[in-house]
Amino acid sequence: MGVTCVSQMPVAEGKSLQQTVELLTKKLEMLGAEKQGTFCVDCETYHTAASTLGSQGQAGKLMYVMHNSEYPLSCFALFENGPCLIADTNFDVLMVKLKGFFQSAKASKIETRGTRYQYCDFLVKVGTVTMGPSARGISVEVEYGPCVVASDCWSLLLEFLQSFLGSHAPGAPTVFGNRHDAVYGPADTMIQYMELFNKIRKQQQVPVAGIR
C-alpha cells in the first residue's frame, strides 16, 4: 500500500447526500478514473466495563474495533489515545469473551460503503457513512500507491484532492504530523477513519439534511 488521506465531503448546497456522492463519482469518471469494485470500513465502539473501574471515579476508556475490506484477514483494535493493535479476524470472538472488561456501546456501529476507483497511481474510494439505517455523511479516501512516506507525497496528494474536491480538499491528516518521515502503514489509515467516524458522530445531533 501507499500513503492515504481520509476526509469528509460535506453535502452540496441544495443537494441530497446521495446526489452529492453521484456528483463526486461523475467528476472522477470525467477525469478518467475507472471503477474497481466496492469497499467497506466498519467500526464498533467498546467501553471499559463498570466492574473494572473501581470506586475511585475513574473515567472509562474506549476501544474501537474496526474492519477494512482491503485487509479481509485482519481486525484493527484502536485504543483511545493509545496504540493500534492489528489482529486476525478471530479478534471479534475474543471480544465476546472479554465482556467482563470491555462492553459494546449501544447502537455504536458505524460504517462507510462505496465504490473504488483507480486513476493512474491513485486509488480513490467514495463512501456513504451510515449509522443503523441512516446515512450520516460522505467519506473520501485517496491513496497514492508509489510512495510510503507521507512527507514525500503530501503536496501531490493535495493537488489531486483539489482536482475533484475543490475548496473542500482537507488539510494534512494528524497522523502525517506524528509520523513525518516514518513508513506509512494500514494502522495509519484506520486511525484516520476512526477520527472521521467520531467527527461524524458528533455532527449528527441534527438531521443530515441540515448540513450545508
From Swiss-Prot:
One of its GO terms (molecular function) is transcription coregulator activity. GO terms for biological process: positive regulation of transcription elongation by RNA polymerase II; positive regulation of transcription initiation by RNA polymerase II; RNA polymerase II preinitiation complex assembly; skeletal muscle cell differentiation. The lineage of its organism: Eukaryota, Metazoa, Chordata, Craniata, Vertebrata. It comes from Mus musculus (Mouse). Keywords: Activator, Nucleus, Transcription, Transcription regulation. This is Mediator of RNA polymerase II transcription subunit 20. Belongs to the Mediator complex subunit 20 family. It comes from the Eukaryota. Component of the Mediator complex, which is composed of MED1, MED4, MED6, MED7, MED8, MED9, MED10, MED11, MED12, MED13, MED13L, MED14, MED15, MED16, MED17, MED18, MED19, MED20, MED21, MED22, MED23, MED24, MED25, MED26, MED27, MED29, MED30, MED31, CCNC, CDK8 and CDC2L6/CDK11. The MED12, MED13, CCNC and CDK8 subunits form a distinct module termed the CDK8 module. Mediator containing the CDK8 module is less active than Mediator lacking this module in supporting transcriptional activation. Its main location: nucleus. It holds the Pfam family Med20. InterPro entries: Mediator_Med20. The keyword Membrane does not apply. GO terms for cellular component: core mediator complex; mediator complex; nucleoplasm; nucleus. It is found in: Nucleus. Component of the Mediator complex, a coactivator involved in the regulated transcription of nearly all RNA polymerase II-dependent genes. Mediator functions as a bridge to convey information from gene-specific regulatory proteins to the basal RNA polymerase II transcription machinery. Mediator is recruited to promoters by direct interactions with regulatory proteins and serves as a scaffold for the assembly of a functional preinitiation complex with RNA polymerase II and the general transcription factors.
